[in-house]
Amino acid sequence: MQNENPKRVWLYARIPGNDVETLRCIRECAAKAQQDNCNIVGTSTDERPGWLLRPGYREMMRQVKAGKIDCIHIYRMRQISGKEQHLFRFFQQVMQHGVKVVTLEYSLRDRLHEYRLGMKIENYAARHKLP
């Protein structure tokens, strides 16, 4: 049975200093979204390293908070952040709004355990009765 309302997906990529690779990641995320019969409602990229100067990330999170997306496709978690506290805050925010995260390069569950976030996120979800 086909889902009448395809998932609304946002694509995000960030590889500082490498526009070609960033665009390749966006293309692969778009292909995955199309394969999953999702509706791509937005795309953003960031060019800079660090956490503060990331307008693409901020726009994506505005859309999350506004309830405009159901899923975020990213190529790898490091494109969000390599820091545990930033990743935890990211997952808190998307979970509060029921947004699913899909990574293409590897298993998200395995990667969260590598970042020591698996149990933290599961505990947070249980405390707040989130899926």
What function would you assign to each model-found segment?
Residues M1-P131:
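Short, structured surface patches at the beginning of a domain
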